[in-house]
Amino acid sequence: MTATRFLARMSLDTDVGTALSDTRIRLLEAIEREGSINRAAKVVPLSYKAAWDAIDTMNNLAPEPLVVRVAGGRQGGGTQLTDYGRRIVAMYRALEIEYQSALDRLSERLNEVTGGDIQAFQRLMHSMSMKTSARNQFAGIVTGLRVGGVDYEVRIRLDAENEIAAVITKASAENLELAIGKEVFALVKSSSVMLTTEPSLKLTARNQLWGEVIDIHEGPVNNEVTLALPSGRSVTCVVTADSCKALGLAPGVAACAFFKSSSVILAVYG
């Protein structure tokens, strides 16, 4: 039987999905070279929307933005890596070299033990992977815990300018071992997020994130709208095409994404 060799295609995962992968790193490298998300997406290759989705996810999960938009807009090459983004790319490539070396040693050992039959090991690795369908994924720090009759209200600071609240059961809070200062991930489905462009509108929803429309992906009935938040993060929601038109949504328009605290799902490491 032919000996099996693992090839490094490294991905760095969080409990809510992949944060960094070979494809995403190649996208970042292409942005650095091309200075344009459109041209970078073609180099990888990725669709224009998939490239922006990847960037939004990375920026939302990282403590600092990896990519920023600069004067010129989404259509004119106004995209560049931050210094933090460049450091992440360099770190990833250095880890990849070490990762390949470790895989070579592992492959040699497994071939000695199993004669190259490692399908069971590969199936185990596959079964342990996890992804989430929630479009909005935010990394944050617990800043407040308030006990209610049957639930907990959890305050999460996303960054210096944005904070959200989640309401979960006492059992869930105990299972997650929540405490002030603990890092958590907040997941919010795009279908749970609503939009308004009226600053004076009084809302009952606890979570209100003001930003600027940067992308509208149009569908036959619903549109997917993405707002850029001041911190470099983003939030995506699904609204009907009619509502999108009535609100006058277009790139550059200021809008507020709001959602109930009960719509927020929390996850933690380990």
Curated annotation (Swiss-Prot):
GO MF annotations in UniProt: DNA-binding transcription factor activity; molybdenum ion binding
Family: Belongs to the ModE family.
Gene Ontology biological-process annotations: molybdate ion transport
Lineage: superkingdom: Bacteria
Function description: Involved in the transport of molybdenum into the cell. May have a role in the early intracellular capture or metabolism of molybdenum.
Cleavable signal peptide: none
Lineage per the UniProt record: Bacteria, Pseudomonadati, Pseudomonadota, Gammaproteobacteria, Pseudomonadales
Cystine residue pairs: none
Organism of this sequence: Azotobacter vinelandii
PANTHER family according to UniProt: DNA-BINDING TRANSCRIPTIONAL DUAL REGULATOR MODE (PTHR30432:SF1), TRANSCRIPTIONAL REGULATOR MODE (PTHR30432)
Protein name: Molybdenum transport protein ModE
Keywords, alphabetical: Molybdenum, Repeat, Transport
Domain spans labelled Mop: 131-197, 202-268
